[in-house]
Amino acid sequence: MPPEAWPEGLDLQPETIGLHNEGGVLRFAQPPDLLRSQALEAGLPTLQIEVMHVVDSTNTRMMQHAADASVAQKLYLAEFQAGGRGRRGRTWLSPYARNLSMTLGAAMSRPLPQLGGLSLVVGLGLASALEDLGVEGVQVKWPNDVLINGAKVCGILIELVQRGDGCEAIIGMGVNVRLAEQERAQIGQPAADLVSSGVTESRTELTVALIRSVVASLELFEAHGFSRFIDIFNHLHRFHGEKCAVTMGAQRVTGEVVGVGEQGELILATASGEQRFHGGEVSLRAEDSSD
């Protein structure tokens, strides 16, 4: 990459991601596992794919484009996110060309009240792909995480844009492929990566496998709603049957997780009876842990 190709407006220098200026060309000390656009297009022929080297956030970029045109069937990927976002305003850390930062646009014909389980459906799509890749100990965590043996490997952030009677879902997915120890320490919670779990596929191959599985899950959700996913979610849910605490702002409710409902809501058996919680600004933790 020539230095003049470096994106303007980013509070980031090439050296931050390991690039060095050698004779007027920005280079890496070791060749990174870059995403291959042609292979992505061949593996995902129904999608319009854009691979960006450095971007603020793939979700932010797609939201900007959604203001002017449809983003259905579009897939944005970034080698590096300078401002990746997670749920509840958190930052998603993503070193250059070592993890996956991607956003999928999907048209949803169901009305907004029926989309409560959407993040769970996406999580199950990712989890299914990981199991097919041979990863053991795959779990999901309500409402939007995928885990390996209790440690987070994938995060999901979904934003919705109204389109007539339906909407378009802007589905952001971050997947840890290869994490260094210092990066794990920065995350602030138990984190897993795919390489440590025995996955040898390239980032391009992983992207194709993950997105194919997510698209298949979305198609099933569009046709049948969330009811088809309840049993498998309960089976894979990290906290199913356990004593947990649900936090909503200053409110904290404890009880046993008994499952999820037909709109993806969490069902908690409490001392005062059954309570149901929807996603958004809600945190779920084991009863003896802190958020």
Give the residues covered by each predicted segment.
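Conserved active-site carboxylates
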Residues: 145
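Short loop/edge segments at beta-strand edges and connector loops
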Residues: 53, 140-142
